[in-house]
A protein has these predicted regions:
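"…together with the soluble PPM/PP2C metallo-phosphatase catalytic core" -> "…together
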Residues: 1-185
Length: 185
């Protein structure tokens, strides 16, 4: 949280003050400044996924309405979030469609797995650990950090979600977990 806050403060201070008083910090934050709009899109879409799940938990949405919400969240992420599956495909529209399909697939896969105590969270924890290792080996440290933090959070939740469960994720939790898995993968 403090690092995110420092980025906001340094952005507000302006480039001249940054270069004069924080030259090393400013050089290290160049990538953060460039990725901040995409990061905000990812955070906003994650919040939208949680809200979609909360609404479904409270009002039992029809499947097609939930699917439309999932497609919209995935489309915004694929368009402005900087997340895309290329698979060596040179056609951006095909890559975009595959990315949207992947997000919707992962949303629903995690939601489907959430029918037994600890299954969805345990599976997600293991997946996050592997994604963190793969990203770290490939030098993608932001993705590795996000996956490692998600693995730790999911493992902590799993302790209370395993049989006999004392807390449950619901659709809001499974949508958030599915969104994180789709982003990290």
């Amino acid at each position: 949280f403090l690092s995110f806050l420092s980025v906001i403060i340094l952005t507000a201070l302006g480039r001249g003050i940054q270069l004069r008083y924080f030259p090393g910090l400013t050089e290290g934050l160049k990538g953060v400044f460039l990725a901040l709009p995409q990061f905000c899109v990812l955070v906003g879409c994650a919040a939208a996924a949680v809200l979609l799940g909360l609404y479904d938990d409270k009002h039992s949405m029809k499947a097609w309405k939930k699917l439309i919400g999932q497609i919209l969240i995935a489309a915004v992420t694929a368009t402005w979030g900087g997340v895309s599956i290329t698979l060596f495909i040179g056609i951006p529209l095909v890559s975009w469609c595959i990315t949207v399909f992947w997000f919707v697939f992962i949303f629903n896969a995690v939601n489907f797995f959430d029918n037994m105590d600890g299954l969805a969270v345990g599976t997600a924890t293991i997946a996050f650990i592997f994604f963190a290792c793969a990203a770290a080996v490939n030098g993608q440290y932001f993705v590795a950090s996000l996956a490692a933090l998600s693995a730790g959070s999911a493992a902590g939740f799993w302790l209370y979600n395993r049989a006999p469960a004392s807390i449950f994720m619901g659709d809001s939790g499974s949508h958030f977990l599915g969104y994180l898995l789709a982003v990290v993968s």
